[in-house]
Amino acid sequence: MKKPITLAAAAIVGALLAFILIPDNKSAPTFSLTDLHGQTVNNAGLQGKVTFINFWFPSCPGCVSEMPKVIKMANGYQGKDFQVLGIAEPIDPVESVHQYVKEYGLPFTVMYDEGGTVGKAFGTQVYPTSVLINKKGEVLKTFVGEPDFNKLYQEIDQELAK
């Protein structure tokens, strides 16, 4: 009896999150963060590129589980008008983020959202959460949990073809 109740509760939470997160085709929230190398990253860097923003942290099991696929995606779209941005949430200390990035050789820009303000602006409450943004800086889709990467690749390819 507990299993159907748990599944129903999960479905309700998922439905509520769909209303909390940024609606599709709205401009991405304004943000400015410093990456792990000291460079400023902000909304201006979204223009002209399809962007996948991944909100994560190193001790998050789901985040760690999907990270090899995010790395593969970043490598697979190198040289195209596509970028991955990793925004580490302040659940873990910044030192853990640096260690994880170094250990796994993340091939994309990673920032530490020290105050959690960017995650809040994007409506993240569950991790991992990822956002696909078009070349105009508009949110195309928000993924709570690991996305279906095959479908994600199709969406990226469609946007790159525009």
In which residue ranges do the predicted regions lie?
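A short beta-strand-turn-helix
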Residues: 31-51
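N-terminal targeting signals for export/organelle localization
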Residues: 1-34, 162
